[in-house]
Amino acid sequence: MARLKAPELRELDVEELERRLAETRRELFNLRFQHATGQLENTGQLREVRRNIARLLTVLNQKRQEK
């Protein structure tokens, strides 16, 4: 998954953010599994996905507090 940018995420609604968060968490699970079995070549993906999750959670919490 490409790097998610906060300004782009702020344009999305809460439901879409939650869907993307679930999808990204699934991706992190799969990457961790690949890493544990020695199949993951680019370990930097783990860091990128973790940071994407953090961005999603940040924007999601900001939107929830606006209400």
From Swiss-Prot:
The superkingdom listed in its UniProt entry is Bacteria
NCBIfam families found in the cross-reference section: L29 (TIGR00012)
Keyword Isomerase listed: no
In Swiss-Prot or TrEMBL terms, this protein is called: Large ribosomal subunit protein uL29
List the keywords (alphabetical).
Answer: Ribonucleoprotein, Ribosomal protein
Output the InterPro entries linked to this UniProt entry.
Ribosomal_protein_uL29, Ribosomal_uL29, Ribosomal_uL29_CS, Ribosomal_uL29_sf
The membrane spanning regions, by residue number, are none
Recorded GO MF terms: structural constituent of ribosome
SUPFAM superfamilies, alphabetically?
A: Ribosomal protein L29 (L29p)
> What organism does this protein naturally occur in?
Rubrobacter xylanophilus (strain DSM 9941 / JCM 11954 / NBRC 16129 / PRD-1)
Cellular component GO terms held in the UniProt record: cytosolic large ribosomal subunit
Give the GO terms filed under biological process for this record. translation
Regarding protein family, the annotation reads:
Belongs to the universal ribosomal protein uL29 family.
